[in-house]
UniProtKB/Swiss-Prot annotation:
GO CC aspect terms: cytoplasm
Protein name (Swiss-Prot/TrEMBL): Ribosomal RNA small subunit methyltransferase H
Predominant location category: cytoplasm
Organism from which the protein derives: Burkholderia multivorans (strain ATCC 17616 / 249)
Annotated keywords: Cytoplasm, Methyltransferase, rRNA processing, S-adenosyl-L-methionine, Transferase
Gene encoding the protein: rsmH
Length: 313
């Protein structure tokens, strides 16, 4: 319960203010977490409004089931299933989609979940521990090349190859040492390889991020849900996305820019600008946490929120 109480929703008021444009609309919270955004959205909706939330984490589902509001429903699945899940409920268009990306404080702070290098625990890292392959299972079979690519591409770690070599060497000792199945040992292996220190960062930060992203297919799911949100939004509907690292933010930024720009046409062709299809999105802007919020919640420091609005039906 203590971890539940420690969780602070980032950019709470700003996100809900940007998202909810009509109190009778249908809204989607793609990442329920511990319900901060969902509760705030419900507080702004009228009797006819609806909110459908998604989460992969069974503990988030337990929390959501305690809300007890007829306007609210929860889906135990990735937000990548949004299009199909809403279609199954007869919903074709929504007034807004909110995505609060990344891992939540209760997940990080619970050593049993395997997300943190600060306390020893089982090497799991799955948002939903009942589905898919754990971090330990993946590390036990991944090739040197796959390890290198994941740590380099998802962790932006310049020592990716050296870390991957150390992990393969550790795996070769499994008969003598047992499997690599604890966060503490993984952090120790990375710490022995990464000798340089980034200010305020543990040497294992990038590797843990990379493995977590891979195990949970976070970036692939993000691309799927952005495409789904674009097709689901009604005219005037809002897409609000909060990201916490550059990989996520880059995908969101490029997606919004790509769909807020008129199609490129060879100037030699006899086509007038008014004859071109209008871009489907308008970029509203981006926001960062205030100094006061960062002081109260240091984990908010890296957050950036991007907002776009659907222009066309």
């Amino acid at each position: 319960m203590g971890n539940e109480l420690q969780h602070r929703t980032v950019l709470l008021d700003e996100a809900v203010e940007s998202l909810v444009t009509r109190p009778d609309g249908i809204y989607v919270d793609g990442t329920f977490g511990r319900g901060g955004h969902s509760r705030a959205v419900l507080a702004r909706l009228g009797p006819a409004g609806r909110l459908i939330a998604f989460d992969k984490d069974p503990r988030a589902i337990e929390t959501a089931q305690g809300i007890g509001d007829a306007r609210f429903s929860i889906v135990h699945d990735s937000f990548a299933s949004m299009r199909d899940a809403l279609a199954a409920r007869g919903i074709e268009k929504v007034s807004g989609v909110l995505l609060d990306l990344g891992v939540s404080s209760p997940q990080v702070d619970d050593p049993a979940r395997g997300f943190s290098f600060r306390a020893d625990g089982p090497l799991d890292m799955r948002m939903d521990p009942t589905r898919g392959e754990s971090a330990a299972e993946w590390l036990a079979r991944a090739s040197l090349q796959e390890l290198t690519e994941v740590i380099r591409d998802y962790g932006e770690e310049r020592f990716a190859f050296q870390i991957a070599k150390a992990l393969v060497a550790r795996r070769a000792e499994s008969d003598r040492l047992g499997p690599l199945d604890s966060t503490g040992e993984l952090a120790q292996i990375v710490g022995h390889v990464v000798k340089t220190r980034e200010k305020g960062k543990d040497p294992a930060t990038r590797t843990f991020q990379a493995i977590r992203i891979h195990v949970n297919q976070e970036l692939a799911d993000l691309q799927v849900v952005l495409d789904a949100a674009l097709s689901l939004l009604e005219q005037g509907g809002r897409l609000v996305v909060i990201s916490f690292h550059s990989l996520e933010d880059r995908i969101v930024k490029r997606f919004m820019q790509a769909h807020a720009s008129a199609p490129a046409v060879d100037r030699r062709l006899p086509i007038r600008a008014v004859d071109l299809p209008s871009p489907p999105l308008k970029i509203i802007g981006r926001q960062f946490p205030s100094e006061a919020e960062v002081a109260a919640n240091p984990r908010a420091r890296s957050a950036v929120m991007r907002i776009a609005e659907r222009l066309t039906p």
